[in-house]
């Protein structure tokens, strides 16, 4: 079978930088699926992505589909022919659909009967007749939230398309994609190299683009150049560059020919909190800040130019001129904001809505203040500090700095609180109230901050659920999933003695009569338990282990964590499988006898069979032994003790008829099984385990 290299390049206007990688990877994934579904053999599939192009290169692609055998089973012989042996309408219709007559059909015999059977070898089509359609199908499946039209065309894509190249070896594949006819024309860099040129063979890509067009189409290559050169540049400055992956990815998606340069700003700006300067450099300008070995910000930054200039100093000076006014603004805002105390902003919070049905930011502040104090008391943290931090929690939203540089909220609250002489734990709590902000983010670093962070999130959860605006599908405008997971992470990872049902009740109470959803507490608790399921699955715990624990509806997150770990360990014991099966059996028996009134306890005088006497004795001993373990949340030790029941339970079921005809004996045995099940349920519903 002859093979060729296949190339598709879609030349566009500037693609969304934050989506470039996902677009390219998705394009390659969907096109590979098209090839596999069409039974086209191929080698490695490589994707390329630059600001103005998406491309795929496929090695060793077969020039035609592989031949395949088509097999179709028809009606059973009994239904295929009538009593006179003539084909029925069902048989004739089936044969006609396959392009044959009934006489031409084969017979398929199995131990279940005999059927009409059709078998044919289908020759594969030439791939040059299929590729354009397959590319179009793959492009149609890209994750594009908003499509656009351009000119007078009816086609839609993420950005206007100017060139399309489809090459199989040196053969141009004819086809129209997104309204553009396939051609050999490829466009180069806007300002360097050749503006456009022709490509003769798919194997020339991407080298020809590098040599003639001055474009590095390989995304990972551009990224590695930026990382290498930026690290080297930072070392020459005696520092370390902040090369956060998200910003490096964005910059990689913005340039076709990366040239790393260094620039500086005036040292006086270092008097402004570093977070504000960094926000300007990273968020607005896409610059990489540089820190010294101790982590202090240096008056330098690294940026990536999209052009190789004969006078790089001119580019450096231009970028320094661009960033200076932004840094000067930050300096001005910082000085202006400190002319009044942070607390002086409280009245202005009354003028800003939190949510139209839930009051102002001042209302939210008052609720956070009260709830933080409530939580701090439960945690054993300083109540006065927690309420003080709650009172000041939203004041920085009214400052000039945060109004202009929104991502500095919390951080600026901390700096202004320190300037005002507030307690350090209070100041830090203002910054950390929003943590954790994303998966893997740091948790609040002190008990006061934890209390405020939990209060801030629980207030939002209770309020939004309280007016019936639950997250639906992918829509979660108030980031309730993130808030719920944040609360759970803080409580679990800091092992705090908090109950989410109790927290929700208090948070809802503080809203007074503003909430309309009467089920707000149960709704929030169920939502948070659902977050537990998703989180612990991501951590690698099995779904049935999680469900076994959730069946007990544990509302103390730290307790949930202890139970999941205990059940996970229990499953490693050799007794686990037998006891899980026994629990299923017990659960089924009790469910069928739900209307039976059980005894308050097992009656020793009614016990007859030696096996039930033994089980009752073991249960009695274990009940006394397990009580302190349950009280201290030593669930793993408790389950190890319960594992010792395996043989006794097995003997009981092997030798004893639970549903005895004597009612007194029957009820006593059901009571004993109920006590057995209740011991396991103190940890989890083991019967759920698969």
From Swiss-Prot:
Location(s) in or outside the cell: Cytoplasm
Keywords: Aminoacyl-tRNA synthetase, ATP-binding, Cytoplasm, Ligase, Nucleotide-binding, Protein biosynthesis
Any single Pfam family the record assigns to this protein: DALR_1
Catalytic activity reported: tRNA(Gly) + glycine + ATP = glycyl-tRNA(Gly) + AMP + diphosphate
Entries under InterPro entries matching the protein: DALR_anticod-bd (IPR008909), Gly-tRNA-synth_bsu (IPR015944), Gly-tRNA-synth_heterodimer (IPR006194)
Residue ranges the record marks as coiled coil: none
PROSITE patterns xref list: AA_TRNA_LIGASE_II_GLYAB
UniProt xrefs under SUPFAM superfamilies: HD-domain/PDEase-like
Keyword presence, Cytoplasm: yes
MF terms in GO: arginine-tRNA ligase activity; ATP binding; glycine-tRNA ligase activity
EC identifiers of the protein: 6.1.1.14
Superkingdom of origin organism: Bacteria
One annotated Gene Ontology cellular component of this protein: cytosol
Keyword Amino-acid biosynthesis on entry: no
GO biological process, one term: arginyl-tRNA aminoacylation
Subunit text: Tetramer of two alpha and two beta subunits.
HAMAP family listed in its UniProt record: Gly_tRNA_synth_beta (MF_00255)
Family: Belongs to the class-II aminoacyl-tRNA synthetase family.
Protein name: Glycine--tRNA ligase beta subunit
Organism listed in the record: Proteus mirabilis (strain HI4320)
């Amino acid at each position: 079978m002859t093979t060729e290299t296949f190339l598709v390049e879609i030349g566009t206007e500037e693609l969304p930088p934050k989506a470039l990688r996902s677009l390219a990877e998705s394009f390659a994934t969907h096109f590979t699926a098209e090839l596999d579904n069409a039974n086209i053999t191929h080698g490695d599939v490589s994707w390329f992505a630059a600001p103005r192009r998406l491309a795929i290169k496929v090695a060793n692609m077969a020039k035609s589909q592989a031949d395949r055998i088509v097999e179709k089973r028809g009606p059973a012989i009994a239904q295929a022919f009538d009593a006179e042996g003539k084909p029925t309408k069902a048989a004739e219709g089936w044969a006609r659909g396959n392009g044959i007559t009934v006489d031409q059909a084969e017979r398929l015999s199995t131990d279940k009967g005999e059927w009409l059977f059709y078998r044919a070898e289908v020759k594969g089509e030439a791939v040059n007749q299929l590729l354009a359609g397959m590319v179009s199908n793959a492009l149609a499946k890209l994750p594009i939230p908003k499509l656009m039209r351009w000119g007078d065309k009816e086609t839609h894509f993420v950005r206007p398309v100017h060139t399309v190249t489809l090459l199989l070896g040196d053969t141009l594949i004819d086809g129209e994609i997104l309204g553009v006819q396939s051609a050999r024309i490829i466009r180069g860099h806007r300002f360097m190299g050749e503006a456009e040129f022709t490509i003769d063979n798919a194997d020339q890509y991407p080298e020809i683009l590098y040599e003639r067009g001055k474009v590095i189409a390989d995304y990972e290559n551009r990224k590695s150049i930026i990382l290498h050169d930026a690290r080297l540049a930072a070392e020459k400055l005696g520092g370390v560059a902040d090369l956060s992956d998200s910003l490096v990815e964005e910059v990689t998606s913005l340039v076709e020919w990366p040239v790393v340069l260094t620039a500086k700003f005036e040292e006086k700006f270092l008097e402004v909190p570093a977070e504000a300067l960094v926000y300007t450099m990273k968020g607005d300008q896409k610059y990489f800040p540089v820190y010294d070995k101790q982590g202090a910000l240096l008056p330098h930054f690294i940026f990536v130019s999209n052009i190789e200039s004969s006078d790089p100093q001119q580019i450096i000076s231009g970028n320094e001129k661009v960033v200076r006014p932004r840094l000067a603004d930050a300096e001005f805002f910082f000085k202006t904001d400190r002319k009044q105390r942070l607390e002086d902003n409280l009245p202005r919070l009354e003028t800003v809505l939190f949510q139209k049905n839930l009051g102002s930011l001042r209302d939210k502040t008052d609720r956070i203040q009260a709830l933080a104090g409530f939580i701090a008391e439960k945690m054993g943290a300083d109540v006065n500090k927690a309420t003080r931090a709650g009172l000041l929690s939203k004041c920085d939203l009214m400052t000039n700095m945060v109004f202009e540089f929104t991502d500095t909220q919390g951080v600026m609250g901390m700096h202004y609180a320190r300037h005002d002489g507030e307690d350090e734990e209070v100041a830090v709590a203002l910054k950390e109230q929003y943590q954790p902000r994303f998966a893997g983010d740091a948790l609040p670093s002190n008990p006061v901050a934890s209390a405020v962070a939990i209060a801030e999130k629980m207030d939002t959860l209770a309020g939004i659920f309280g007016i019936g605006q639950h997250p639906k599908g992918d829509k979660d405008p108030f980031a309730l999933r993130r808030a719920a997971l944040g609360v759970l992470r803080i409580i679990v990872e800091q092992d705090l003695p908090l109950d989410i049902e109790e927290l929700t009740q208090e948070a809802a109470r503080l809203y007074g009569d503003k909430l309309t959803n009467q089920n707000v507490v149960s709704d929030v608790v169920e939502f948070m338990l659902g977050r537990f399921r998703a989180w612990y699955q991501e951590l690698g715990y099995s779904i049935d282990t999680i469900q076994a624990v959730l069946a007990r509806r544990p509302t103390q997150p730290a307790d949930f964590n202890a139970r999941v770990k205990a059940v996970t360990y229990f499953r490693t014991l050799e007794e686990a499988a037998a006891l899980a099966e026994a629990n299923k059996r017990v659960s089924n028996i009790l469910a069928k006898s739900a209307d039976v009134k059980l005894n308050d306890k097992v009656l020793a005088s009614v016990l007859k069979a030696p096996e039930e006497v033994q089980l009752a004795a073991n249960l009695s001993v274990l009940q006394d032994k397990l009580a302190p373990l349950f009280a201290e949340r030593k669930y793993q030790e408790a389950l190890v003790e319960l594992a010792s029941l395996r043989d006794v339970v097995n003997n009981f079921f092997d030798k004893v008829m639970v549903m005895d005809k004597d009612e007194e004996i029957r009820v006593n045995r059901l009571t004993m099984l109920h006590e057995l099940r209740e011991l396991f349920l103190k940890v989890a519903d083991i019967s759920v385990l698969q």
